[in-house]
Amino acid sequence: MVKWRNFYLMKIYDSKNKYIGVVDDISIDFYNGVVKGFTISPASIFKKHTYVSVDSIISVDEIMKIKNTSRFEGLKFKEIKYMDIINKEKKLLGVLEDLIIDEKTFEIKGMIISSGIF
């Protein structure tokens, strides 16, 4: 199991060892509880942010090796990070801090919630 922050700023290379950029965010399918892909902050200032789906990932270790990039799809984690988490009794539990992800299947296994300072 790994956290979202383990992927943040990870270097990405294609199958020909060309440097593509770094991981900027993850794309999630919250209803199915899976990571769909990663948004990439490109190495070149002339390229827009790009995206790689989990199907195009060859390997993940210290760096990420990919086959190709594609169009973005899904919900970005940064859009929901620090969102208030409320239980069924409408009691505030805290804010969403991080996700726990299975590094082989890219399933979201849990959420880290910070209670903050009250």
Where are these regions (language model features)?
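Peripheral interaction segments used for macromolecular assembly
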Residues: 1-118
